[in-house]
Regions:
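Conserved G1/Walker A P-loop phosphate-binding module
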Residues: 1-68
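C-terminal-of-GTPase-core extension/linker across diverse P-loop GTPases
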Residues: 2-7, 77, 88-221
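Ordered, soluble secondary-structure elements with a strong preference for glycine-centered loop motifs
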Residues: 14, 48-49, 77-80, 142-145
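Conserved catalytic-core segment of NTP-binding enzymes
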Residues: 23, 49-62, 71-98
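Generic enzyme active-site microenvironment
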Residues: 37, 71, 106
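Walker B catalytic acidic pair
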Residues: 40, 74, 109
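Short hydrophobic alpha-helical runs that function as membrane-insertion/retention elements
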Residues: 66-70, 189-190
Length: 221
């Protein structure tokens, strides 16, 4: 999934310890906005004691994420048990929904399901998206390369929830503001007038929109 979404070349195989280190790639969201996608170590039941600390160290990065994406093998008969194990580990490192962190689930390997199972999975996934108090789930098949566009849109919807689109007029003498907007926001439209004023429509997170208004409220309309 990581490689398909980012067109990366990360080693991927269904085997123990296939991914040990955290890998980062740029994910281009449907709107064109970039996001950093990190591939962390997988979760393993009954991990040997001497490896627990090493795995925990790599998972510490999880706490810094704006959004967690839990990839599940939905064809695994023990998939619900695996899910509970993951949630327990997240809670132990003070990450996940119990600690105010957004998370979505990706239900991979739907190509291995029968028609009846698939119908039930689709119904559950749709309900999860429509109900705000449920964790959103996105059925995909990396093997068949299906469901990825819907997943990418779901990721963007989660990341941009609460964002604001502001119109900002930046005069020539304050082009440091323009640089800040490019660094911290997603510039949707930008034009420069004859007097040098830069007119910008930019998407900002709620916190960054607040910072902009606090520092330069005269530029925001």
């Amino acid at each position: 999934m990581f490689n398909l979404l980012t067109e990366g070349g990360v080693f991927a195989k269904d085997m123990l310890f296939a991914t040990l280190d955290t890998t980062h790639r740029v994910l281009r969201l449907p709107s064109g906005q970039p996001a950093i996608l990190s591939d962390t170590v997988g979760f393993i039941s009954d991990l040997p004691t001497d490896l627990i600390d090493a795995f925990r160290a790599t998972l510490e990065e999880v706490k810094e994420a704006d959004l967690l994406i839990h990839v599940r093998d939905i064809s695994d008969p023990l998939t619900e048990r695996r899910r509970e194990e993951v949630m327990q580990v997240l809670d132990q490192i003070k990450a996940g929904p119990e600690h105010g962190q957004d998370i979505i689930e990706v239900w991979n390997k739907i190509d291995l399901l029968g028609d009846v199972q698939m119908d039930k999975i689709e119904e559950r996934a749709q309900a999860s998206i429509e109900l705000e108090d449920m964790m959103s789930a996105f059925p995909i098949s990396c093997h068949a390369k299906t469901g990825l566009a819907r997943l990418a849109q779901g990721i963007e919807d989660q990341l941009t929830a609460g964002d604001e689109i502001l119109h900002v007029d930046v005069p020539p003498q304050q082009y440091d503001v323009r640089a800040w907007l490019h660094k911290n926001g997603h510039v949707i439209k930008e034009t420069t007038k004859r007097n040098g004023t830069c007119e910008m429509d930019v998407r900002l997170s709620e916190s960054d929109a607040g910072k902009l208004r606090a520092r330069h409220k005269d530029l925001v309309s």
